[in-house]
Regions:
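Short internal beta-strands
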Residues: 51-57, 136, 311, 329
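A structural signal for short hydrophobic beta-strand segments in well-ordered beta-sheet cores
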Residues: 28, 148-150, 215
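Alpha-helix/helix-capping structural signal
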Residues: 12, 59, 180-181, 229
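Conserved beta-strand termini and adjacent loop/short-helix elements that scaffold enzyme active sites
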Residues: 81-83, 135, 216-218
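Left-handed beta-helix
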Residues: 1, 155, 181, 188-359
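Active-site glycine-centered loops adjacent to acidic/histidine catalytic or metal-binding residues
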Residues: 12, 111, 138, 227
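Conserved N-terminal catalytic core of the sugar/cofactor nucleotidyltransferase
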Residues: 1-8, 16-22, 29-30, 34-109, ...
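Conserved core of the sugar-phosphate nucleotidyltransferase
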Residues: 114-190
C-alpha cells in the first residue's frame, strides 16, 4: 500500500458548545491546555503520515490556519481545504478528493480524541488492505451516532446514521481509514433526510458492492468533545497522564500535591494546587485553591477563589468567590468577580445561548 495521507475535518458550527464557539472554532477549544485539533495532527504524525489536509469552514477557517500553521511544528505538511457548507462527512471526502488523489487515507474528526493514537491501526490497515477500516465502541446512547451491525466479529453488515431504534450499541468512532474506492461510493449516494451525504451511506455502498470493510472495536477511551460534559471528561482523561513539572514560581506558603504541571512564568502566592492539573505560562494564583482535573491556560488570574474540574481559557480571571467553582468552562478573557459592597446581588451580562448555573 502506498503512503497514506491524512484528512482532518475541522468545519461545522459547534452549536453544542455555544457560546464558546460564537468566537472560536470548536476544534481549537483546549483540553489540558492544548487545542483538541492538535491531538489529531500529532496522532497522524506519530503514525508516519506526513501530508495532512484540513477541512475548514468559511466562518472559522482563518483562525484554524493561524493557530495550526503550515504543519512544520508537528513535522507534517498541512493543506487547507475549504468546504463552503457542512453537507456531510462524505461531502467533505469529495471536497478533499483533489488533495487526496489516488492515495489511501485516514480521516479524523477534528473534535475527537482517541486514547493511544492511531499508529497500530494504520499498520493494521496497511497489512490487511481492506477498502475501509472503521472504529467502533459501545455507547449508552447509540441513537446519537452512526451505528454498525456486524456479521460475527470481522465483517460489517449494515451502517445507519443516528437511527431512531438502534439495532446495536456499536457507535462509529470519529476515525476512518479508506482506499480511493470511497470517492466512487460517495458520488453514488444520495443526500439523507437531513440533506447531507452521510459517510455511513458511503461505507454501506462499499459493503453492498462486496468490498471489504473491516471493523475494529476500540478498547481504550474515545471522546467526541462537542458538548461541555464531554470536553470536561476529555480534560480529565488527558490530565490523568499529565507530566509532573514545575517551571514556574512558588512562594514558601504555596504547595503542590500530586501530578501538576506549572509552566514557566506562572506564579503561585499562598495557594494550593492539587493534581492532576496544569497551570499555563504567565498565570497567577493568589490566595486560592485549584483542585484536580483543572486546566488553567496562559495569562489567567485566580485570586481568593476555589476552582476544580474546570477549564479556563487564556486571559480569564476569577476573583473573590465565596464558593467553589467546578465543572465549568470559561472562554478567553472572561472575568468572574464578586463585589463585596452591600446589598449583595447578582449582576450579569450574558450573551445569546449562554448558560449560568447557581448552586
Amino acid at each position: 500500500m502506498e503512503q497514506l495521507r491524512g484528512l482532518i475535518l475541522s468545519g461545522g458550527k459547534g452549536t453544542r458548545l455555544r457560546p464558546i464557539t460564537h468566537t472560536s472554532a470548536k476544534q481549537l477549544v483546549p483540553v489540558a491546555n492544548k487545542p483538541v485539533l492538535f491531538y489529531g495532527i500529532e496522532a497522524m504524525a506519530a503514525a508516519g503520515i506526513k501530508e495532512i489536509g484540513i477541512i475548514i469552514a468559511p466562518e472559522t477557517g482563518e483562525e484554524i490556519k493561524a493557530v495550526a500553521g503550515d504543519g512544520s511544528r508537528f513535522g507534517v505538511q498541512i493543506t487547507y481545504i475549504l468546504q463552503d457548507e457542512p453537507l456531510g462527512l462524505a461531502h467533505a471526502v469529495l471536497t478533499a478528493e483533489p488533495f487526496l488523489r489516488d492515495a489511501p487515507f485516514v480521516m479524523y474528526l477534528g473534535d475527537n480524541l482517541l486514547q493511544g493514537g492511531i499508529s497500530e491501526l494504520v499498520e493494521r490497515f496497511r497489512t490487511n488492505a481492506p477498502e475501509a477500516l472503521i472504529l467502533l465502541t459501545p455507547v449508552p446512547d447509540p441513537e446519537n451516532y452512526g451505528v454498525a451491525e456486524l456479521n460475527g466479529s470481522n465483517t460489517v453488515k449494515r451502517l445507519v446514521e443516528k437511527p431512531k431504534e438502534p439495532a446495536t450499541d456499536l457507535a462509529l468512532v470519529g476515525v476512518y481509514m479508506f482506499t480511493p474506492e470511497i470517492h466512487t461510493a460517495a458520488r453514488a449516494i444520495e443526500p439523507s433526510a437531513r440533506g447531507e451525504l452521510e459517510i455511513t451511506d458511503a461505507i454501506q455502498h462499499l459493503v453492498d458492492a462486496g468490498r471489504r470493510v473491516e471493523p475494529h472495536i476500540v478498547t481504550g477511551w474515545w471522546k467526541d468533545t462537542g458538548r461541555l460534559e464531554d470536553m470536561l471528561e476529555a480534560n480529565r482523561l488527558i490530565l490523568e497522564n499529565v507530566e509532573q513539572r514545575i517551571d514556574g514560581e512558588l512562594d514558601a506558603a504555596s504547595q503542590v500535591e500530586g501530578r501538576v504541571c506549572i509552566e514557566a512564568g506562572a506564579r503561585l502566592v499562598r495557594s494550593t494546587v492539587r493534581g492532576p492539573a496544569i497551570i499555563g505560562a504567565g498565570a497567577t494564583l493568589t490566595d486560592c485553591y485549584v483542585g484536580p482535573y483543572t486546566a488553567i491556560a496562559e495569562g489567567c488570574a485566580i485570586e481568593r477563589a476555589e476552582v476544580e474540574h474546570s477549564i479556563l481559557l487564556a486571559g480569564s480571571s476569577v476573583c473573590g468567590l465565596d464558593g467553589r467553582m467546578e465543572s465549568s468552562l470559561l472562554g478567553r478573557n472572561v472575568a468572574i468577580r464578586r463585589d463585596d459592597r452591600q446589598p449583595r446581588a447578582y449582576r450579569f451580562m450574558v450573551g445569546d445561548n449562554s448558560e449560568i448555573g447557581i448552586l
